[in-house]
Curated annotation (Swiss-Prot):
GO biological process, one term: protein secretion by the type I secretion system
EC number(s) on file: 7.4.2.5
Purpose of the protein: Part of the ABC transporter complex LktBD involved in leukotoxin export. Transmembrane domains (TMD) form a pore in the inner membrane and the ATP-binding domain (NBD) is responsible for energy generation.
Name of this chain's protein: Leukotoxin translocation ATP-binding protein LktB
Record GO terms (molecular function): ABC-type transporter activity; ATP binding; ATP hydrolysis activity; ATPase-coupled lipid transmembrane transporter activity
All residue ranges annotated as the ABC transmembrane type-1 domain in the record: 155-437
Record Pfam families: ABC_membrane, ABC_tran, Peptidase_C39
Topological category with respect to the lipid bilayer: Multi-pass membrane protein
Reactions performed catalytically: ATP + H2O + proteinSide 1 = ADP + phosphate + proteinSide 2
Family: Belongs to the ABC transporter superfamily. Protein-1 exporter (TC 3.A.1.109) family.
Comment field on protein domains: In LktB the peptidase C39 domain, the ATP-binding domain (NBD) and the transmembrane domain (TMD) are fused.
Enzyme class name: translocase
ABC transporter domain sequence ranges: 469-704
Length: 708
């Protein structure tokens, strides 16, 4: 009745869903009590005030349909008649709108005409304060500005060295001018010797300072690289489970590898070329002093370089995008193939996999070749402009020398100075491909670094949990347009109780435990431990006190001891051995040559499936968690290993709340209570013998199937 009453106020329903989307928990009744004073539902003003009270940033705007694709979604479409709904996604290519019908509690895809019929032009944009801060700290090229400021002393030293290098570059042509116009004309050998020695000293200083600049610059950019790499890995491990479940492993790895492109760019010549380019104004002043006409030729060539780059850049970027997409596909396919090598060999499908690889590799090589061809065309275009300018300057300079407006020494000095000006321009033009590639890399890496992490700040780190668990009115789906996985689930689990959960595949058993670990926030309802809402709890605090054993567990390429004591490497050996004995793993570990120091191999490849499972159980028990989850934990064990664990089950369960998820009913028959699930709902619960008394029940049906 309460749910129906809340459903009548679609504004309150929308606020609840949007708050949970932003990982903010609320009590609908409390919001209704504070802001729905007349009992007629939340008005526009009260809705905005309620959102503000939840630390949400809400803004009411009027937006034309043609511009809806520009706003941050999901957003609330406000209707004067109270029939509000959520706008989740705008598909501009097909003119379709993914919405969420709050009345029917279901997603809907509307056509352009259908959406226009119900859209009144009013929209409420909602974001969390944390999201606003995150958007201000987005990863793009501006991310490097604080890093540059942090190492400003080093960059200032680099700038000073660059100034001296430019002074030396300015002096060298003057020496050549003196030699050509004075020494050769007057045959001044003593002056020649002095100039030669001075030039040698300048060259030595120039080489030393240039090397020093490169060293200092590379050292500072390497520090930035380390900071970025560390930030990337920390951020990657802080991302929610949903990020990894919605992306291919190879695609994520490919994005992380883009760090190499950024590293190469930072430690390359591009940034030093920019510094050299900044000093070109001084050279232009000296060149203008020599010959305004020749200087105008050089200045006239600069727009040609810029226009050529503007023409090439968009095409190059599209081809680089395509190249990255092909590379990511190859990376994903390679990771998938190596991971599934046992299946590939068992089914003898290597020829089919090879054929797919060959096609994908050919596509990547073709895409890479198109990038190379375009880059070559770009570089040759730059060379053409440079050679053309050189010919014009030679012709015009010769005329000026013949007419007496310029000496031979001045012409040579001018050409040397123009080379100092054009060289960084050409280097930058040639490095433009690298810059485009780095732009792509920053965008791809931004997909990782700009994805919101699980929020820890402001979350409650509560005292050690006791083990009381409550699921209240839980409704959950993995995606807005996906089917409902859990529907109106209510379950109370007392401290120290052993609960078995059974049901057909896809009934929502494992999803319950994922909500308990706070991998996801329910669409509706609350998950509480000891009366504390998990939406407000620190995920790390929670997960440290929950032991989980899955059907397929992953071991790291370390020793058995390190795998068991993964959460506390300094754990006493006695605790490790005790946990291994409880899990039935101590005997087989003792028989190994290296014992607990045996390296298990990548993902535990050096052990059998049953051995891996027992080590995983020991790993879950070693921290003495107050809540223990066995999700098909014994299904991969042989009967002897399962028998050992079931014998120890009383010790394992002592002093903790245990949730056993199993298809084998024999695993849960001794549980204090058995929960039977079907299509996301709890259909039966009771003890083993009580459930068998209902011959028409699902539990009896499953029990009969296993007996047969």
């Amino acid at each position: 009745m309460e749910a129906n009453h809340q459903r009548n106020d679609l504004g309150l329903v929308a606020l609840t869903m949007l708050a949970q989307y932003h990982n903010i928990s609320l009590n609908p009744e409390e919001i209704k009590h504070k802001f729905d004073l007349d009992g007629k539902g939340l008005s526009l003003t009260s809705w905005l005030l309620a959102a503000k009270s939840l630390a949400l940033k809400a803004k009411h705007i009027k937006k034309e349909i043609s511009r809806l694709h520009l706003v941050n979604l999901p957003a609330l479409v406000w209707q004067d008649n109270g029939k509000h709904f959520l706008l989740v996604k705008v598909d501009t290519d097909n003119n379709r709108y993914l919405t969420y019908n709050l009345e029917q509690d279901a997603p809907q895809i509307l056509s352009q005409d259908e959406f226009e019929a119900c859209y009144q032009g009013q929209l409420i944009l909602v974001t969390s304060r944390a999201s606003v801060v995150g958007q201000l700290a987005k990863f793009d090229f501006t991310w490097f500005i604080p890093a540059v400021i942090k190492y400003r002393k080093i960059f200032l030293e680099t700038l000073i060295v660059s100034i001296f290098l430019q002074i030396f570059a300015l002096i060298t042509p003057l020496f050549f001018q003196v030699v050509m116009d004075k020494v050769l004309v007057h045959r001044g050998f003593s002056t020649l010797n002095i100039i030669t020695v001075a030039l040698a000293i300048v060259i030595i200083f120039e080489i030393v300072l240039s090397g020093l600049r490169t060293y200092v610059f590379s050292h500072s950019t390497s520090r930035i690289d380390v900071e970025l790499g560390a930030k990337l890995f920390r951020h990657l491990l802080s991302l929610p489970i949903s990020y990894f479940e919605n992306r291919r492993v190879g695609d994520t790895v490919a994005r992380v590898r883009e760090l190499d492109q950024i590293r190469n760019f930072l430690t390359g010549q591009a940034l030093t070329s920019v510094l050299d380019l900044l000093f070109s104004f001084i050279f232009f002043a000296v060149m203008w002093y020599y010959s305004p006409k020749l200087t105008l030729v050089i200045l006239g060539s600069l727009p040609c370089y810029i226009l050529w780059s503007i023409f090439i850049s968009p095409i190059l970027r599209r081809r680089l995008d395509d190249k990255f997409a092909r590379s990511a596909d190859n990376q994903a396919f390679l990771v998938e193939s190596v991971t599934a090598i046992n299946m590939i060999k068992a089914m003898a499908v290597a020829p089919q996999m090879t054929d797919t690889w060959d096609k994908q590799l050919a596509s990547y090589v073709s895409s890479s070749f198109r990038v190379t061809v375009l880059a070559t065309i770009g570089q040759q275009g730059v060379q053409l402009i440079q050679k053309t300018v050189m010919v014009i300057n030679l012709w015009l300079g010769a005329h000026l020398v013949i007419s007496g407006d310029l000496s031979i020494g001045q012409l040579i000095a001018f050409n040397m100075l123009s080379g100092q000006v054009i060289a960084p321009v050409i280097r930058l033009a040639q490095l433009w491909q690298d810059f485009q590639q780095v732009g792509i890399s920053v965008t791809r890496l931004g997909d990782v670094l700009n994805s919101p992490t699980e929020q820890y700040q402001g979350k409650l780190s509560l005292p050690e949990i006791k083990g009381d668990i409550s699921f209240k009115n839980i409704r959950f789906r993995y995606k807005p347009d996906a089917p409902t996985i859990l529907n109106n689930v209510n379950l109370e689990i007392r401290q120290g109780e052993v609960i078995g959960i059974v049901g057909r595949s896809g009934s929502g058993k494992s999803t319950l435990t994922k909500l308990l670990q706070r991998f996801y926030i329910p669409e509706n309802g609350q998950v509480l431990i000891d009366g504390h809402d998990l939406a407000l709890a620190d995920p790390n605090w929670l997960r440290r006190q929950i032991g989980v054993v899955l059907q397929d567990n992953v071991l790291l390429n370390r020793s058995i001891r390190e795998n068991i004591a993964l959460s506390d490497p300094g754990m006493p050996m006695e605790r490790v051995i005790y946990a291994a004995k409880l899990a039935g793993a101590h005997d087989f570990i003792s028989e190994l040559r290296e014992g607990y120091n045996t390296i298990v191999g990548e993902q535990g490849a050096g052990l059998s499936g049953g051995q891996r499972q027992r080590i995983a159980i020991a790993r879950a028990l070693v921290n003495n968690p107050k809540i223990l989850i066995f999700d098909e934990a014994t299904s991969a064990l042989d009967y002897q290993s399962e028998h050992i664990i079931m014998q120890n089950m009383q010790k394992i369960c002592q002093g903790r709340t245990v949730i056993l998820i199993a298809h084998r009913l024999s695993t849960v028959k001794n549980a204090d209570r058995i929960i039977v699930m079907e299509k996301g709902e709890i259909v039966e619960q009771g003890k083993h013998h009580e459930l068998l008394q209902n011959s028409n029940g699902l539990y009896s049906y499953l029990h009969q199937l296993q007996l047969n």
